[in-house]
């Protein structure tokens, strides 16, 4: 199981990303728009750089929803491969069954 502090830090990052997401999207649209003046583009870049580092979505780590394991994460289930396998064997995941061919 992951350290509780790492899980808490990741949750805090998710909140910060959600708080700044709309403004970041606006600034990125201004920067990428070819019709934007150089001055406006520069202002948008400065504002984007002045935002907190954790406001970027790439700073959030996908973690297992049960124990916070950071590796082997399966998006479809929100679980790590280890936890998904355990739950599938116990029949706790609807629609999942062992394959055979």
UniProtKB/Swiss-Prot annotation:
The keyword Ribonucleoprotein applies. One of its GO terms (biological process) is translation. Residues 61-70 have a biased composition (Basic and acidic residues). It holds the Pfam family Ribosomal_S14. One of its GO terms (molecular function) is rRNA binding. Residues 53-72 are annotated as: Disordered. Keywords: Ribonucleoprotein, Ribosomal protein, RNA-binding, rRNA-binding. InterPro entries: Ribosomal_uS14 (IPR001209), Ribosomal_uS14_bac/plastid (IPR023036). Belongs to the universal ribosomal protein uS14 family. Part of the 30S ribosomal subunit. Contacts proteins S3 and S10. Binds 16S rRNA, required for the assembly of 30S particles and may also be responsible for determining the conformation of the 16S rRNA at the A site. NCBIfam families: PRK08881.1. This is Small ribosomal subunit protein uS14. It comes from Corynebacterium glutamicum (strain ATCC 13032 / DSM 20300 / JCM 1318 / BCRC 11384 / CCUG 27702 / LMG 3730 / NBRC 12168 / NCIMB 10025 / NRRL B-2784 / 534). The lineage of its organism: Bacteria, Bacillati, Actinomycetota, Actinomycetes, Mycobacteriales. The gene is rpsN.
């Amino acid at each position: 199981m992951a350290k509780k502090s790492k899980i808490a830090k990741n949750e805090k990052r998710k909140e910060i990303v959600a708080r700044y997401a709309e403004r970041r999207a606006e600034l990125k649209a201004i920067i990428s728009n070819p019709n934007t003046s150089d001055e406006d583009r520069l202002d948008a870049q400065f504002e984007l750089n002045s935002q907190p580092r954790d406001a970027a979505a790439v700073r959030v780590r996908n973690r297992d929803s049960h124990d916070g394991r950071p590796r082997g994460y399966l998006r479809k289930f929100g679980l790590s491969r280890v936890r998904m396998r355990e739950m599938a064997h116990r029949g706790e995941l609807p629609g999942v069954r062992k394959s055979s061919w």
